[in-house]
Amino acid sequence: MEYGACSPNGLLELGGDPQALIQVRTRNAADALAAAHDILACPHVGALLLEIEGMPKCLDLVASRRLSLAAAESGVTAFLLRHGAQAQPSAALTRWQVDSMPSQAKDDDWGNPVFAAQLTRHRAGGLGSFSMKWNPANACFETPDIGAVVAAPADRPAHQKIAI
């Protein structure tokens, strides 16, 4: 992983089993793609998280199609994280952009992680934006409580452009 490694403690807090995690580090994107294909061919793999920096030439439409077919054949969910890359054609079923959001911290803890997720591509349609909060106790995402919201003004539109 270019941006660090999965933290066993963090994975445990999110409801995962750190002992079930296998991390593979490669020297370059081509080796990472080869390792991903090997992993997708293994039985008993729950998911694959492949992280690639930028837009390497080896990750073209053909390579993404091969990954997609291997994942479909094995039944393994494959995630491709691309840091510092522009959107480009791929064989992915979906494309998401995920950003962090402020969590609702309480006096006794940091609060659970909250994300803004945008589904930017889906072969079957149905694009949209979602706010989601991770609930580690139930190991699922929930709609975050955004707290108090100011009522819209009755005498004017809620959003008003102001000339400066």
Give names to the regions the model predicted.
Residues 1-164:
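N-terminal regions of ATP-driven nucleic-acid and macromolecular assemblies
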